[in-house]
């Protein structure tokens, strides 16, 4: 598998919608396929449900990695880490993204839709996907 042809599962709740759409664009620009388990609306969504679907896709090897977005990223991280074989990392900066891959072999990236701006999202996702 080349680093440029991964299947990336995406999931978000209502608070992570805008950030998920930004992440989806970044993932596509980097040449990866997106499998979207998240919501496309602003109505309330139970984050554990969508986190589980995306994490299960990684666990079953239907996706190579996953990126999950909710308000803080904490809930998605907790929910995803309940799935066997998943190593979800909540990352708020570039160093977290790099270390989570290099030292922890994370296969799920959890992000905050409320706390991260577009530039930070881009850098974190790019580093995490290329490390």
Give residue ranges: language-model regions:
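Mid-chain, well-packed structural core segment of small domains
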Residues: 68-69, 74-114
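Short active-site oxyanion
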Residues: 7-8, 63-66, 85-87
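Short, solvent-exposed amphipathic alpha-helices that sit
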Residues: 18-30
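Short, Lys/Arg-enriched N-terminal segments with co-localized hydrophobic residues
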Residues: 1-5
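A short beta-strand-loop structural module common to alpha/beta enzyme folds
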Residues: 33-44
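Short, structured active-site "lid" loops
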Residues: 50-72
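C-terminal binding/interaction regions
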Residues: 9-18, 94-131
């Amino acid at each position: 598998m080349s680093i440029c042809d991964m299947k990336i599962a995406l999931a978000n709740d209502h608070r992570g919608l805008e950030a998920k759409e930004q992440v989806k664009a970044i993932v596509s620009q980097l040449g990866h396929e997106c499998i979207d388990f998240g919501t496309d609306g602003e109505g309330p969504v139970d984050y554990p449900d969508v986190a589980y679907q995306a994490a299960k896709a990684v666990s079953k090897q239907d996706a190579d990695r996953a990126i999950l977005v909710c308000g803080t990223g904490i809930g998605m991280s907790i929910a995803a880490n309940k799935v066997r074989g998943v190593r979800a990392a909540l990352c708020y900066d570039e160093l977290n993204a790099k270390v989570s891959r290099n030292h922890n072999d994370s296969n799920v990236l959890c992000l905050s839709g409320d706390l991260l701006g577009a530039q930070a999202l881009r850098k974190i996702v790019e580093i995490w996907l290329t490390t």
